Amino acid sequence: MAVKFHLCLLLIILVGMGAHVAFADLPLCDYPYGACFYRADPCPDDMPVECPNYFYCPQQTDRCCCYE
């Protein structure tokens, strides 16, 4: 039973690390570049550029809006 638990825990850790590695090449969407906003909301007027190809947001429901 303990072996199954440890294997399951290892699988969860590896999947979590794999999801993080997918974004490792992109920097975090944060000041001074921009900020993360909910996908359904428009980007604010002072950050009108949507830039998901250059920065990533930790929440999958968010997108990155950048300064001009």
From Swiss-Prot:
One term of GO molecular function: toxin activity
Keyword Thylakoid found: no
Keyword line: Disulfide bond, Nematocyst, Neurotoxin, Secreted, Signal, Toxin
The record's account of how the chain is modified after translation: Contains 4 disulfide bonds.
Transmembrane segments annotated in the record for this chain: none
Compartment annotation: Secreted; Nematocyst
Native source organism of the sequence: Orbicella faveolata
Functional description taken from the UniProt entry: Induces neurotoxic symptoms on zebrafish. Has also been claimed to be implied in calcification, but tests on homolog proteins suggest that proteins of this family have a neurotoxic function and not a calcification function.
Protein name: Small cysteine-rich protein 5
Family affiliation: Belongs to the Cnidaria small cysteine-rich protein (SCRiP) family. gamma subfamily.
Major location (coarse): secreted
Signal sequence residues: 1-24
GO CC terms of this entry: extracellular region; nematocyst
Presence of keyword Secreted: yes
